[in-house]
Amino acid sequence: MYDLIIVGAGPAGIFTALELLRKGSTPHKILLVEKGKPVEKRHCPKDKTGVCVNCKPTCAITTGFSGAGAFSDGKLSLSYQVGGELPDLIGEDFAQELIDYTDKIYLEFGADPKVEGVY
């Protein structure tokens, strides 16, 4: 029996589980369900064929634990001025606070602290 089932182990699912475990007032038994493969079993046929073969039932690059970010170069936009409409919805200061909070979590789990592209 689980207190909560999270569908999707991309960044949103992973961060949701982490926040619930860290900030929950009671212990949570959480099931994180993902239709893709674990990171260590995600291999793209394009590496051998040179072309996308439209994997079925799911793409090994975009689906699986950590989502497409598992194979990204790790770039994050660390300014509310880059991206969508979040600052319009919650304000610039709060948007930046959330971005900084998220960056600290990534750093806690081993992200490279070097920041590039700052102007």
Predicted regions and their residues:
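A generic structural motif
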Residues: 25-30
